[in-house]
């Protein structure tokens, strides 16, 4: 069985990398999240650093007596870090952050922040580089 690739399919994938991700805040307010490829070098580096910072937050041991306290602390930390990313990639970062901050529960708020970030990362994903011919 042979896989057939079309130029149109390639074109769609390539265009997707350059298109913003649109997040609806309300019926009449949307925020666009710029793709990584359209950011300047310093902004790209800051985004990558922030994502690494989130990934470096340690897992919480459920048996730890301070686990409940740590969950809230880590949740707030995640929101702070991801907000930095939104300030770099969003057309209206204050509106996006304000909408996410309406959630009072720090755990749910952190999950909302992470979901928006994850959606942006998936939708604008660069993918793996093709192996070089040898």
UniProtKB/Swiss-Prot annotation:
Gene name per UniProt: 24
Organism: Mycobacterium phage D29 (Mycobacteriophage D29)
Keywords in alphabetical order: Viral release from host cell, Viral tail assembly
Function: Promotes tail assembly by creating a scaffold for the tail tube proteins. The tail assembly proteins Gp24 and Gp25 would wrap the linear tape measure protein to create a tail assembly scaffold. It would allow polymerization of tail tube protein during which Gp24 and Gp25 are released and therefore are absent from the mature virion. The tail assembly protein Gp25 is produced by a rare -1 ribosomal frameshift. The ratio Gp24/Gp25 is important for proper tail assembly.
Family: Belongs to the L5likevirus tail assembly protein family.
Name of the protein this chain belongs to: Tail assembly protein Gp24
Record Pfam families: GP24_25
Subunit structure: Interacts with tail assembly protein Gp25 and tape measure protein.
InterPro entries: Gp24/Gp25 (IPR020132)
BP term (GO), one: viral translational frameshifting
């Amino acid at each position: 069985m042979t896989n057939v690739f079309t130029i149109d399919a390639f074109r769609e994938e390539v265009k997707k990398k350059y298109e913003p991700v649109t997040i609806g805040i309300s019926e009449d307010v949307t925020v666009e999240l710029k793709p990584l490829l359209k950011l300047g070098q310093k902004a790209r580096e800051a985004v990558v650093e922030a994502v690494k910072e989130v990934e470096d937050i340690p897992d919480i041991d459920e048996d730890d007596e301070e686990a409940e306290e740590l969950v809230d602390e880590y949740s707030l930390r995640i929101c702070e870090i991801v907000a930095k990313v939104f300030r770099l990639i969003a057309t209206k970062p204050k509106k996006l952050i304000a909408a996410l901050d309406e959630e009072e529960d720090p755990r749910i708020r952190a999950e909302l922040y992470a979901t928006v970030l994850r959606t942006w990362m998936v939708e604008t994903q660069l993918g793996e580089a093709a192996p070089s011919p040898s």
